[in-house]
């Protein structure tokens, strides 16, 4: 019934198994990948026909996590999986980025990749198996794909690179880097690091690429065994006559446009060139396919002009050389009621970054397959359409916004203070108000500045820069601080963030089939030069953490005995509610007895702290207290006196006065304030008090007679 194929290979400390022919046989290809107890099922489906008028490559990648994979039932009312989580979106992008450049130009058939996690080992992340499964399934589908690709996670522990580290090993690692590529070159890198030098980062990329050859070879052997039917697809032939016509109409105007330094004026000139082409070559009778072909020729002509100018040593689009960073403008404290804010402008790219401080109650709760955890630092990136002068829909963040926010967050994680040194929850929002290249790196710079503006004691300043590449044959140029057009028309988007001491985040996407180690070395060196330049200007604007905003909560931390927690909370939460209501504070009590008080003023925090100290204080033997009589006991036993909130003691009838007391009510009344001395606290916490011990003993009559 099943024509099943299995391939097993050793990958670091893990055994990887590829299987096909048993599940989802109606898909173009389907592969089940096992790495330890983590199992990911990947299916590829294709459209043999191109949709009418299609002028782009419609690749869709969806990575999905099923809660049953971890033996869980989803929360919520409907008890089923809903919209994709941030982890699912980021992993979908991780799969997409290295495979997209391996499809030939002009291939416009629909391709859908669905990677589904069906079993999960908490120690083995499912992203690497998902990437390997997508690679294998694409090769088995027979589509024109210049793969397979391999993928590897690289850690760096005690000066040694570790292949595919477990979750426990990553906790000790200074690096979490994912690299993907073909047998010949690297295509994609995604990483975060704890301030590592450039040579260590490059070494990790090279190490990962070397190690992934095992996976690439295994997938090739797997494909040879399955022997899939290969698509008979040929790239459409170039219409040289049409190319010549478009060049004749628009060539000179395009060259003139790319001499204009200002983006909007340049765009207007390019629109003029395109309108001339449309007027001359596109009529009502022209079908969509032909119109798209003309548009594609025009876009390639734009790319040719920009690329040839740069490779010939001419100035870039905005007049810079290959190493210069655009002019910077930095302002902090730009919003009066926020906790911290910064406006970071680099050329025509601008980010308004705003930092907000909160308490531990504001931490983000993440219900991951591997278990629930909280996150005390959030960074959210918003890219509204007005940032590029366009009209567009506003709504939930798109995949790109999620990815850019995550990259900026990775860049700042290494410099955040430890929770014990700074117990606030931190949220940064980066609003991109202008965009012409590298808005994610503007978010890194702006995010760092806004945190400093909010008074967060960062370990160091962090800046980010985006590098580009133009590569033709043996000629290449690495570009510092790329513009939007250089990103679209170039061959690489290489983003590096870090401090003066080293790299904290690195992301690389290659649009061609790989680059060499030499190019990566040059890009890292140029990026460091630019990063140091930006850091100098950031430090000149904000040397270190500013004073805490008057509008930010003040956090006061204290520690109480665990057996006192219930006293502070009170019956049904009555005590803690009264403290928060009376002092206007927020109080959080951890299981270990650590109490965090959030207050808007020092006075309110001190008042709440004092109340808690009173509740948790122990009565000291020999100490004098001012107390209130709360009860007269029956049978003339004595009275109960409250000496502290929640702390009562017994004044026995014999301890009320030196003379013999016949009726307690003759001496004490409920509500009466008296001074008492603590005589004893027994093993059960019961307190004996005395009023008599503070009274002078009466003078005897015989002494008086003398």
From Swiss-Prot:
EC number, as in UniProt: 2.7.7.8
Gene3D superfamilies: GHMP Kinase, N-terminal domain, K Homology domain, type 1, Nucleic acid-binding proteins
Gene Ontology biological-process annotations: mRNA catabolic process; RNA processing
PANTHER family in the record: POLYRIBONUCLEOTIDE NUCLEOTIDYLTRANSFERASE, POLYRIBONUCLEOTIDE NUCLEOTIDYLTRANSFERASE 1, MITOCHONDRIAL
Ion transport in keyword set: no
S1 motif domain span: 622-692
This protein's record includes keyword Manganese: no
SMART domains per UniProt: KH, S1
Source organism of this protein record: Neisseria gonorrhoeae (strain ATCC 700825 / FA 1090)
Function: Involved in mRNA degradation. Catalyzes the phosphorolysis of single-stranded polyribonucleotides processively in the 3'- to 5'-direction.
GO cellular component assignments: cytosol
Protein name according to UniProt: Polyribonucleotide nucleotidyltransferase
CDD domains named in the record: KH-I_PNPase, RNase_PH_PNPase_1, RNase_PH_PNPase_2, S1_PNPase
Reaction equations catalysed: RNA(n+1) + phosphate = RNA(n) + a ribonucleoside 5'-diphosphate
Residues that, per the record, bind Mg(2+): 487, 493
Family per similarity comment: Belongs to the polyribonucleotide nucleotidyltransferase family.
Keyword terms: Cytoplasm, Magnesium, Metal-binding, Nucleotidyltransferase, RNA-binding, Transferase
Cofactors (names): Mg(2+)
Enzyme class: transferase
InterPro entries linked to this entry: ExoRNase_PH_dom1, ExoRNase_PH_dom2, ExoRNase_PH_dom2_sf, KH_dom, KH_dom_type_1, KH_dom_type_1_sf, NA-bd_OB-fold, PNPase
Residue span, KH domain: 553-612
């Amino acid at each position: 019934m099943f024509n099943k194929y299995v391939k097993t290979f050793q990958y670091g400390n893990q055994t990887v198994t590829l299987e096909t022919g048993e599940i989802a046989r109606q898909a173009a290809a389907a592969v089940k990948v096992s790495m330890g107890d983590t199992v990911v099922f990947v299916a590829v489906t294709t459209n043999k026909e191109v949709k009418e008028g299609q002028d782009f490559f419609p690749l869709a990648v969806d990575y999905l996590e099923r809660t049953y994979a971890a033996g869980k039932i989803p929360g919520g009312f409907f008890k089923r999986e809903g919209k994709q989580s941030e982890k699912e979106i980021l992993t979908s992008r991780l799969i997409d980025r290295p495979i997209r450049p391996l499809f030939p130009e002009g291939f416009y058939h629909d391709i859908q990749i669905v990677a589904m996690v069906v079993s999960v080992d908490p120690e083995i992340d499912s992203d690497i198996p998902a990437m390997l499964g997508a690679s294998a399934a694409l090769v088995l589908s027979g589509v024109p794909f210049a793969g397979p690709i391999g993928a590897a996670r690289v850690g760096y522990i005690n000066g040694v690179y570790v292949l595919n580290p477990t979750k426990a090993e990553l906790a000790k690692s200074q690096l979490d880097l994912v690299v993907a590529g073909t047998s010949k070159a690297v295509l994609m890198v995604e990483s975060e690091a704890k301030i590592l030098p450039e040579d260590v980062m490059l070494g990790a990329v090279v190490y990962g690429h070397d190690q992934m050859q095992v996976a690439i070879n295994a997938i090739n052997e797997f494909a040879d065994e399955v022997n899939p039917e290969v698509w008979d697809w040929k790239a459409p032939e170039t219409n040289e006559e049409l190319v010549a016509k478009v060049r004749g109409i628009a060539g000179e105007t395009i060259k003139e446009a790319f001499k204009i330094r200002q983006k909007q004026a340049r765009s207007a000139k390019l629109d003029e060139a395109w309108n001339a082409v449309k007027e001359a070559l596109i009529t009502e009778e022209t079908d969509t396919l032909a119109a798209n072909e003309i548009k594609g020729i025009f876009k390639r002509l734009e790319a040719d002009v920009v690329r040839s100018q740069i490779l010939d040593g001419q100035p870039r689009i905005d007049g810079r050389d290959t190493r210069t960073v655009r002019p910077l403008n930095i302002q902090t404290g730009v919003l009066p009621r926020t906790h911290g804010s910064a406006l970071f402008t680099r050329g025509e790219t601008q980010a308004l970054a705003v930092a907000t401080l909160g308490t531990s109650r504001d931490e983000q709760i993440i219900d991951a397959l591997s278990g629930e955890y909280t996150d005390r630092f959030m960074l959210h990136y918003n890219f509204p359409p007005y940032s590029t002068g366009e009209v567009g829909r506003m709504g939930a963040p798109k995949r790109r916004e999620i990815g850019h926010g995550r990259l900026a967050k990775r860049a700042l994680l290494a410099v955040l203070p430890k929770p014990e040194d700074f117990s606030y929850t931190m949220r940064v929002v980066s609003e991109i108000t202008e965009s012409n290249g590298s808005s994610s790196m503007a978010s890194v710079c702006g995010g760092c500045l806004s945190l400093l503006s909010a008074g967060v004691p960062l370990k160091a300043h962090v800046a980010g820069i985006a590098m580009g590449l133009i590569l033709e044959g043996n000629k290449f140029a690495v570009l510092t601080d790329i513009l939007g057009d250089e990103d679209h028309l170039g061959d690489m988007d290489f983003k590096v963030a870090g401090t003066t001491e080293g790299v904290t985040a690195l992301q690389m996407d290659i649009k061609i089939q790989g680059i060499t180690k030499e190019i990566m070395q040059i890009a890292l060196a140029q990026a460091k030069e630019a990063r140091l330049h930006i850091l100098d200007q950031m430090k000149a604007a904000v040397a270190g953490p500013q004073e805490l905003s008057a509008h930010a909560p003040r956090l006061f931390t204290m520690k109480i005995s665990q057996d006192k927690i219930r006293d502070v909370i009170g019956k049904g939460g009555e005590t803690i509610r009264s403290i928060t209501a009376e002092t206007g504070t927020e109080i959080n009590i951890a299981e270990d007895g650590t109490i965090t008080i959030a207050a808007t003023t020092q006075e309110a925090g001190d008042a709440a702290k004092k109340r808690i100290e009173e509740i948790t204080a122990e009565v000291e033997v020999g100490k004098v207290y001012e107390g209130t009589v709360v009860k007269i006991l029956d049978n003339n036993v004595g009275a109960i006196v409250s000496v502290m909130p929640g702390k009562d003691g017994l004044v026995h009838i014999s301890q009320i006065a030196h003379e013999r007391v016949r009726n307690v009510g003759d001496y004490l009344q409920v509500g009466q304030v008296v001074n008492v001395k603590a005589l004893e606290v027994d093993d059960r916490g019961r307190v004996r008090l005395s009023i008599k011990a503070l009274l002078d003993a009466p003078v005897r009559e015989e002494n008086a007679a003398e």
